[in-house]
């Protein structure tokens, strides 16, 4: 009984990222396409004052643009959406793999080696430079500057 409750609790706590629900209403929750892809008729076609087409032409042009953009996007996403999602998933999996298994270990190795070198560098500074600059400080500590105005 206790084991079943523990397993049930673990099942509720651990959520697999592959099973998470997606929002079919807000498909851009992080607003990554806020200003980039939003292109409406008014963003592309505009008639300056004094150079207007017939009202009917303007209305039909608006409808044609909007409907053709809508259905062309739907057709392209139907034909290419899944293959491109597969391609992008593969690409980002490769990038993640390289980052996890190559980049981070290289950086960690570099930091370990640099730490060893930094100890040697610090020792050299304390051994050679600190006494030199302390002596120069003593020599220059008795310098007095007097400013006089002439004239």
From Swiss-Prot:
Signal peptide: none annotated. It is found in: Golgi apparatus membrane; Cell membrane; Membrane, Caveola; Cell membrane, Sarcolemma. One of its GO terms (biological process) is positive regulation of myotube differentiation. Changing residue 105 to L: Dominant-negative mutant that induces defects in membrane repair. Sumoylation with SUMO3 by PIAS4 may reduce agonist-induced internalization and desensitization of adrenergic receptor ABRD2. There is a cross-link at residue 38 (Glycyl lysine isopeptide (Lys-Gly) (interchain with G-Cter in SUMO3)). The keyword Ubl conjugation applies. It is a peripheral membrane protein. Its main location: Golgi. It comes from the Eukaryota. Expressed predominantly in muscle. Residues 64-114 are annotated as: Required for interaction with DAG1. GO terms for cellular component: caveola; cell surface; dystrophin-associated glycoprotein complex; endoplasmic reticulum; Golgi membrane; intercalated disc; membrane; membrane raft. GO terms for molecular function: alpha-tubulin binding; calcium channel regulator activity; connexin binding; molecular adaptor activity; nitric-oxide synthase binding; potassium channel inhibitor activity; protein-containing complex binding; sodium channel regulator activity. Homooligomer. Interacts with DYSF. Interacts with DLG1 and KCNA5; forms a ternary complex. Interacts with DAG1 (via its C-terminal); the interaction prevents binding of DAG1 with DMD. Interacts with TRIM72. Interacts with MUSK; may regulate MUSK signaling. Interacts with POPDC1. Interacts with CAVIN1, CAVIN2 and CAVIN4. May act as a scaffolding protein within caveolar membranes. Interacts directly with G-protein alpha subunits and can functionally regulate their activity. May also regulate voltage-gated potassium channels. Plays a role in the sarcolemma repair mechanism of both skeletal muscle and cardiomyocytes that permits rapid resealing of membranes disrupted by mechanical stress. Mediates the recruitment of CAVIN2 and CAVIN3 proteins to the caveolae. This is Caveolin-3. It comes from Mus musculus (Mouse).
């Amino acid at each position: 009984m206790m084991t079943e409750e523990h397993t049930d609790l673990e099942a509720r706590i651990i959520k697999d990222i592959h099973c998470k629900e997606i929002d079919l209403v807000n498909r851009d929750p992080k607003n990554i396409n806020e200003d980039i892809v939003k292109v409406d008729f008014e963003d592309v076609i505009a008639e300056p004052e004094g150079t207007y087409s017939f009202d009917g032409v303007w209305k039909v042009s608006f409808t044609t643009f909007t409907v053709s953009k809508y259905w062309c996007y739907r057709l392209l996403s139907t034909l290419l959406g899944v293959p491109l999602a597969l391609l992008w998933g593969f690409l980002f999996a490769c990038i993640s793999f390289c980052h996890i298994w190559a980049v981070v270990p290289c950086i960690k190795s570099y930091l370990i080696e640099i730490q060893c070198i930094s100890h040697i560098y610090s020792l050299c500074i304390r051994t050679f430079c600190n006494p030199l600059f302390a002596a120069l400080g003593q020599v220059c500590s008795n310098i007095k500057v007097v400013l006089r105005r002439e004239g």
